[in-house]
Amino acid sequence: MKILNCYAGIGGNRKLWNCPNMQVTAVEYDENIAKVYQDLYPNDIVVVADAHEYLLNNYQNFNFIWCSPPCPTHSITNHFLNAQGIKRYPDMALYQEIILLQTFFKGKYIIENVKSYYEPLIKPQISGRHYFWSNFKIPMLQFEKQIGRMNGKKADLGGKIQAELRTNNHKKLGFDLTKYTGIDKQKVLNNCVAPEIGLAIFESALDIYDASKVEQIGLFTEL
């Protein structure tokens, strides 16, 4: 099974993936982050490149594709930023990738992003504050260790307590980045997809997902 993991980061989504004859190609633009990924997953092929362009030129060579394109220009935080005079267009690369895979890709795919400040141009599946575009149904899971991109909760806590919780949740992801340099470790971990969620989605793509193994609160609802 040939898998493409775009915008791979350090591979939070990929951490628990395992199936016979699995070959993962990870694409990450930041060379230092790519080195961490390669160290964590020595059997994966790691490509330092623009994931958006790599996807366009290579999607047809894979059976399963996961994309988590950058989310800042789509996030609801843009309401606050706009009020502060910070104005920016939403990055339409997200929808280019959705249209490409919806129209031409023959395998299974999932594109993940945060819930946007605008009405989505293409109807997604919804989980918490996040949107998913996929050609298969995926279970909605709730884990205490959800953080960063995959966290649908907003704690009403003081800054110190929030920082402590964030540190504890980073540890729960199961990555020890102590020896690595040249990366923003907190940002990298914040951007991680919780490994259990990555596994559940991966198993759903393979039609082997077992809901009894995890806490399940239903299926994604549609807009």
Label each residue range with its predicted role.
Residues 1-223:
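Conserved active-site and SAM-binding loop architecture
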